[in-house]
Regions:
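Glycine- (often His-adjacent) and acidic-residue-rich active-site loop
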Residues: 6, 54, 62-99, 115, ...
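Conserved CoA-thioester-binding segment of acyl-CoA-metabolizing enzymes
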Residues: 1-63, 98
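Conserved phosphate-binding and hydrolysis motifs of nucleotide-dependent enzymes
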Residues: 26, 32, 64, 70-72, ...
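Terminal peptide-recognition signature
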Residues: 23, 27, 42, 60, ...
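Crotonase-fold acyl-CoA enzyme core
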Residues: 98-215
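Hydrophobic alpha-helical membrane-association signature
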Residues: 38-42, 89-92, 122, 196
Length: 220
């Protein structure tokens, strides 16, 4: 299998394998929290995908033990210094979500460890979600005086789990573990942590075996 790596980004790692981009959120020391640089780089990456016909599938994952812990509240000037800064950060992340949905490539989300707040929004914006058995997900924004509705969660979550369960997660802030996520329909499959990459590779291979135009039009 041929592959190539993209070293253009600081907070993202991209490996291209036979028609699939393996896009890794790469701030493991910060649990892949979303800072200003990651926001700008994700906007750039997903904004360019429409014209990258050599990329037919995207596999999104997090480096280290966690998928994404949400907004980096220590990122001065972007999040955490004031409510206006927090809201601006949320609006930029909402644009990432829109670009994820607009791109014609299906996105497979591989979720391990924590997927909270903005990280949970990234997971919801994926077309298919697989979870490791240690995955935990929640909507954390309301706990810090923000809304869980501005970055796509209030749109995608009720469609995945129903209105009552979505309201419970958005207003209660409770964590959902992998087994419950599977029962709720949040994820398609739960596997052991060491098998998560193989599960993603298997589905990516199935997608790549489809007609390129058929796959693209189905996502669109």
């Amino acid at each position: 299998m041929s592959s190539s790596a993209d070293t253009h980004y600081q907070t993202l790692s991209i490996e291209h394998k036979e028609g699939a981009d393996w896009l890794t959120l790469n701030r493991p020391d910060a649990f892949n929290a979303i800072d200003q640089i990651m926001t700008e780089e994700l906007l750039d990456y997903f904004g360019k995908l429409y014209f990258k016909h050599e990329v037919r599938v995207v596999v999104l994952r997090g480096a280290g033990k966690h998928f994404c812990s949400g907004l980096d509240l220590n990122d001065a000037g972007h999040f955490g210094t004031s409510n206006p800064a927090d809201m601006r950060g949320q609006r930029l992340i909402s644009e990432i979500i829109m670009r994820m949905r607009r791109c014609p490539q299906p996105i497979i989300g591989l979720i391990q460890g924590a997927a909270t707040g903005g990280g949970f929004a990234f997971a919801l914006a994926c077309d298919v979600r697989y979870a490791a058995d240690n995955a935990r997900m929640n909507v954390a924004m309301a706990k810090i005086g923000l809304t869980g509705c501005d970055i796509g969660i209030s749109y995608f979550l009720p469609r995945a789990v129903g209105a009552s369960s979505a309201a419970e997660m958005m207003m209660g802030g409770r964590f959902v573990n992998a087994k419950k996520a599977l029962r709720m329909g949040l994820v398609s499959e739960v596997v052991e942590s060491e098998d998560l990459e193989a599960a993603g590779q298997s589905l990516a291979s199935d997608m790549l075996a489809m007609s390129p135009m058929g796959l693209r039009m189905t996502k669109e």
